Amino acid sequence: MRKLLVIAALLALVAVSVTAGIWYNKLVKNPTQEYAYAKGVDAAAYSFPYFLNSVLLNKWSKPPVEGMAFTPSAAVNQFWHLSEMPSAEDYRDGGGPNLDTLYSVAFIYVGEEPIVMSVPPVPDERYYTFEIAGFDSDNFAYIGKRTHGNLGGNYAIVPPGWGGVLPADVQQLAEAPTPWIIVVGRTLIDPNNPDDLQAVNALQAQYRITHLPDWGIDNPPLPPHPPLDGLGALLDPYLADGAPKLIRKVALQDPMLFWQVVNWALDGNGVPARDQSRLPDWATLELGPGQDLSTLDDDTREGLSQSVMQGIRILQSYSDSSLNPGRRINGWRYPAVHMGRSGVSGHYLNRSAMQSMK
């Protein structure tokens, strides 16, 4: 009897082994490719803001183009101002413009020295705001009527750990979490009053960005920044495309370009201390600061290529999925309480899908 039980157990073990082998062969055809795909989907969802902001930085750094009056240009270390009211068709780089404010936007480099943002006195009845975000899209500072009043002022954004002394007429606003930051300003306008346009344009002309070493001199030069040639070499072929169209093209036609751009952004902006634990896994795929995608084998490259589309699909479907902590009440969507600083709160899908993609 014991022999029969032993034989039965051995036969069962063989059957399980054979079944497991068949199951494994069907599901895992190429472990290297599968690993790159699985890790890549997560990395794509995490790093999407770095990709999108690189696209915008490259596009917005270019000189003005005729017929593109509603697309920011020459907006590095100086403000580009929307000088007239747009329509939904006029802006093609994602999101939807307000219809009662005019925008003032800039990418600013704060990697070595502080910069000073200057805001003039603003009439009491006029709302204005400047949202300031790191390259990962998380807001870290704000200037506006509700927090700073309407008297105007000079506000310094400094590199991390900067220990210098500011002039008496400059107040420190915040430390920049990344060397490259984004400023989006809005100034209230009455769309039904044609005369109000001139008043808002006059205010916009007084919004200034100054390199601290040049503070106090007349007609200071633009603050310096690292060259963007490497980024342009990657993205200039797509300059004619709005950001949503560019994302589709890259995902479908050249997904490894996504990772090249992400690596460029991470080289220049790093990964926050709270997320450093991701880097060892990424390094096995040549993703992250200082990594070299050209050394990848074909299987890893194929897995990473496939992961880009899936990562973007997850972000596109996130808004209406159970993953979204926001709520719908009476037809209105209420965003998650950490909206605007989702990455700081550890909600990376929300950061990518709602803060960046939407």
PLM region spans:
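A compositional/structural signature for long, glycine/proline-rich flexible linkers
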Residues: 20-358
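N-terminal Sec-pathway targeting helices
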Residues: 1-21
